A protein has these predicted regions:
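N-terminal nicking endonuclease/strand-transfer module with a His-rich metal-binding environment
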Residues: 1-167
Length: 167
């Protein structure tokens, strides 16, 4: 499932009605970074190289995060949710739910290594809802681009670098 992404839901800063607060302690936070800091880490050097080449001031980029946020080409980040089974066959309250937790934890432990062009800045396993599920928020990016910033946000190119074809 691909969604808009709600970091507040994932970190439980906001708690939905279907959450069992007594089981929230069983949730797993794999990572949680501030997205603006992630953008600085990933793109500041590329932005500086890009700006150094510009002859026109109006083409310079002051803040790449804001450029992407205001633009229509790319999204700031993407979220995917992984779940095994449903509330009937993998309920978080029983042994099958614990099996799902182990599988999803192992999956997450290897996700970044398998997907080097998807920078994971937030990942949370929820055990306090009916079915265990994993939220992964990531910034898709590429390096070595010939146009614009040499390191930039691009879901299509990041997935192509991972071997996925399509448009």
């Amino acid at each position: 499932m691909i969604g808009k992404g709600s970091v507040n839901h994932n970190t439980r800063a906001f708690t939905a009605k279907n959450v069992d607060k007594n089981r929230s302690a069983d949730n797993v936070e794999f990572c949680q970074e501030d997205i603006k800091q992630v953008y600085h880490k990933l793109f500041d050097e590329a932005r500086e190289r890009y700006n150094a080449k510009q002859k026109r001031k109006d083409r310079m980029i002051d803040n790449y995060y804001e450029k992407i946020r205001r633009g229509k080409q790319e999204k700031l980040f993407h979220e995917v949710i992984f779940q095994i089974g449903n509330k009937d066959d993998m309920n978080a309250k029983n042994e099958d739910g614990l099996l799902a937790k182990r599988i999803l934890t192992e999956f997450m432990d290897e996700f970044q290594a398998r997907n080097p062009n998807l920078y994971v800045f937030s990942a949370h396993l929820h055990m306090d809802e009916e079915t265990p599920h994993l939220h992964i928020d990531f910034v898709p990016y590429i390096t070595g681009s010939k146009r614009g910033l040499d390191t930039r946000v691009s879901l299509k190119s990041a997935l192509a670098a991972e071997g996925f074809a399509g448009g």
